[in-house]
């Protein structure tokens, strides 16, 4: 029997209530002390892990504490610092270009709106939402691979069958189901749940707190449902 929209919404909130209990204090995994640092760290996090980003940002932030400092940086020195992350040459170009635009257009101050943030080179909606939600406490719902995977398996979104889901569509559909004050922590919890339990290749269904209601639940071999 096909699940109605009303039933799906009820299930979504029930499952999120469980995630709130399992993950009571979610937080951004990137280390930062101001909006500029978070913006830079988020840009660096593409195609690598937050944990690895945190190993290089202390030196990067200490060496280039302002957007103007980073804009005037010697690219080779930046490359040397962020080399462990991979793609260090292109990331260096992106960082210096971003810092230059930030300094020239916003006086080095990270803007607080989606439109202004996404006008900066290399800043998309995901990065902007991370900055808005975590640096400014402005509701934002970052959609990364974990969020796409988990919302698909839970069938929280209508295009759960899609092999190439649209992050913007996911953002709009999921945020329409939850109050704005929950958006940032909702994203955090889905990401943490995806990392800890709902893995990409081998989800840990046997220890999943949502196994009773998850439409994609797969019982361990030899166990009947």
Locate each region found by the language model.
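Catalytic cores of DNA base-excision repair glycosylases
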Residues: 2-223
């Amino acid at each position: 029997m096909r699940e109605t929209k009303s039933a799906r919404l009820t299930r979504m909130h029930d499952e999120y209530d469980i995630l709130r209990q399992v993950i009571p204090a979610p937080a951004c995994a990137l280390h930062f002390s101001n909006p500029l640092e978070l913006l830079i760290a988020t840009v660096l996090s593409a195609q690598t892990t937050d944990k690895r980003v945190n190993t290089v940002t202390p030196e990067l932030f200490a060496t280039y504490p302002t957007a103007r400092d980073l804009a005037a940086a010697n690219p080779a020195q930046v490359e040397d610092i962020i080399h462990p992350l991979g793609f260090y040459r292109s990331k260096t170009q992106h960082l210096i270009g971003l810092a230059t635009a930030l300094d020239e257009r916003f006086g080095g101050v990270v803007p607080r709106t989606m439109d202004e943030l996404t006008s900066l080179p290399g800043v998309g909606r995901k990065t902007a939402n991370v900055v808005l939600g975590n640096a400014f406490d402005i509701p934002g719902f970052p959609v990364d691979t974990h969020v796409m995977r988990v919302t698909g398996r839970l069938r929280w979104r209508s295009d759960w069958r899609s092999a190439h889901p649209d992050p913007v569509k996911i953002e709009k559909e999921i945020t329409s189901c939850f109050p704005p004050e929950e958006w940032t922590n909702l994203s955090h919890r889905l990401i943490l749940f995806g990392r800890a339990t709902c893995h990409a290749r081998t989800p840990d269904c046997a220890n999943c707190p949502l196994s009773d209601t998850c439409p994609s639940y797969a019982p361990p071999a030899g166990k009947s449902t």
